[in-house]
Regions:
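N-terminal segments that cap or nucleate solenoid repeat domains
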Residues: 2-38
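Glycine-rich hexapeptide-repeat left-handed beta-helix
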Residues: 1-13, 41, 47, 53-55, ...
Length: 182
């Protein structure tokens, strides 16, 4: 089961069409739209400002999203966030892709259809224009006018979320203790 925590009177709001994997933690002012998938080990934590995740966005394993007072995190629709990425009090517009291990800091804005490369660090307040590629530490825009980010990632994670909705714990001595062996 995911861990869903009420913090300071705020309970995460999760659309019935969203998928939250076992081991993920959602705490406080977190809002997930339909089709969102939050994968294993993700932490979405919001004590003082809202975390909003738009329709059909996938937050891959071990993603962290957090906010500071007065600095919300707004993730758009059809966004792909790669494994181990950290999004802190930033805005990521629709159809963007955040690479594995990337870090996006407070007040940064990632434009629609932009790509932040794996391991890049987007500084506080930095703007990555729509449809561009940002790479490096600190991130620099290296390429403009990218073709639209392929929708395969989004469609693939929508299908995976549906598959995992129906997953069951393995049972039997060769798989370790399952629900039958607790």
């Amino acid at each position: 089961m995911p861990r869903i925590l009420t913090v300071d009177g705020h309970t995460p709001r999760i659309d019935a069409g969203a998928f939250v994997a076992e081991g993920a933690t959602l705490a406080g002012q977190v809002h997930l739209a339909a089709g969102v998938s939050v994968w294993f080990g993700c932490v979405l934590r919001s004590e003082r400002a809202t975390v909003t995740v738009g329709r059909d966005t996938n937050l891959q394993d071990l993603t962290i999203i957090h906010t500071d007072e007065g600095v919300p995190a707004a993730i758009g629709e059809r966004v792909t966030v790669g494994h181990r990425a950290i999004l802190h009090g930033c805005t990521v517009e629709d159809d963007a892709l955040i690479g594995m291990g990337a870090i996006v800091l407070n007040g940064a804005r990632i434009g629609a259809g932009a790509v932040v490369g794996a391991g890049a660090v987007v500084r506080e307040g930095q703007e990555v224009p729509p449809g561009t590629l940002a790479v490096g530490v600190p991130a620099k825009v290296r390429e403009a006018e990218l073709p639209p980010v392929p929708r395969r990632n989004v469609a693939g994670y929508l299908a995976l979320a549906e598959l995992y909705r129906h997953a069951e714990p393995a049972r039997g001595p060769e798989h370790g203790p399952g629900e039958d062996h607790a």
